[in-house]
């Protein structure tokens, strides 16, 4: 079953369970007056879409959630075309400069942790790859040269290697290339790219020789068709992210809120609702909720309208949950 169909069923189940257990899903207090415009990361999309659906069902108003990749989302955000930008990496220095030039101020809010997941077809014999083997598959020098699995490592099968991955506007592309190749956006180009992670899922599900990488939630929704590959002997999971073993492919994900948009009551209500329910909904759609302390700090930053980013235009690789908390507390 496709991810989107699973997500719709899942959200219905979330509402039922939350109602039964008395979780924080109380109706938003008043009807919104305008549409909340959101765009950006496909990785963060499932969380934000889950929030938007609940928010609308509880009378908060309408929020539209688009997908154009983290980089594509920031382009719109810094032009003032969206109220909130989903991001699977921190905002970069060039994007900060673009926002500043357009007079767009923003508040940075971490919402969850992701285990960026490398997947293969369930019929593929590969169960573990090293970061060095991944680099040999994906580095620019591999283009036109590494077309079989055993060309990346002699221990792998003599079979065609077909690669799927996010496009260059994706924050996942930025993060993966930095973590695996050693330089952001440094990648071979002879692979099948898409900003729609469901396209990547379909590609691998139909081809026993394919490999792809994307956010953990998309793997979790398709475990009957895909197999996660252990990286340096460690499989992605909530546990291996929390104990810092799944490195370097674990990372925080964010939303960025236009400070001017927060003056609109419906945007303020939506953002408050998001932060009050991010832990529950991020876990429900397949990501790893942050510690309660992280959400408390984020809510304080939101309440105080703390403008800017704790990352100073950099996108660090392998940032632990503890390191994220330290940055947030010192900001």
Stretches found by the model and what they are:
Residues 2-14:
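Bacterial N-terminal signal peptides that target proteins for export
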Residues 18-27:
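C-terminal segment of classical bacterial N-terminal signal peptides
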Residues 1-2, 21-22, 44:
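Extended interaction regions within the primary functional domain
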Residues 26-331:
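Flexible loop/hinge segments at secondary-structure junctions
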């Amino acid at each position: 079953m496709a991810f989107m169909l699973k997500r719709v069923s899942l959200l219905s189940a979330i509402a039922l369970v939350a109602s039964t257990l008395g979780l924080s899903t109380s109706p938003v207090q008043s009807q919104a007056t305008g549409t909340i415009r959101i765009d950006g990361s496909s990785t963060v999309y499932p969380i934000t879409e889950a929030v938007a659906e609940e928010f609308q069902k509880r009378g908060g108003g309408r929020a539209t959630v688009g997908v154009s990749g983290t980089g594509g989302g920031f382009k719109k955000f810094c032009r003032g075309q969206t109220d909130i930008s989903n991001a699977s990496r921190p905002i970069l220095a060039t994007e900060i400069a673009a926002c500043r030039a357009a007079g767009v101020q923003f508040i940075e809010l971490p919402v969850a942790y992701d285990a960026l997941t490398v997947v293969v077809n369930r019929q593929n014999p590969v169960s573990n790859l090293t970061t060095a083997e991944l680099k040999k598959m994906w580095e620019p020098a591999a283009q036109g040269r590494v077309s079989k699995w055993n060309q990346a490592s002699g221990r792998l099968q003599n079979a065609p290697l077909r690669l799927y991955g996010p496009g260059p506007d994706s924050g996942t592309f930025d993060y993966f290339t930095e973590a695996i190749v050693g330089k952001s956006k440094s990648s071979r180009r002879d692979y099948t790219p898409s900003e729609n992670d469901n396209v990547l899922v379909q590609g691998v599900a139909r081809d026993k020789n394919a490999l792809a990488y994307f956010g953990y939630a998309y793997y979790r929704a398709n475990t009957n068709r895909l197999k996660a590959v252990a990286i340096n002997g460690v499989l992605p999971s909530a546990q291996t992210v929390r104990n810092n073993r799944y490195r370097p492919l674990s990372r925080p994900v964010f939303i960025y809120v236009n400070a001017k948009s927060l003056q609109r009551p419906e945007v303020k209500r939506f953002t408050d609702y998001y932060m009050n329910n991010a832990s529950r909904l991020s876990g429900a759609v397949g990501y790893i909720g942050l510690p309660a302390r992280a959400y408390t700090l984020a809510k304080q930053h939101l309440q105080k309208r703390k403008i800017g980013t704790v990352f100073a235009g950099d996108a660090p690789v392998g940032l632990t949950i503890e390191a994220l908390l330290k940055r947030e507390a010192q900001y």
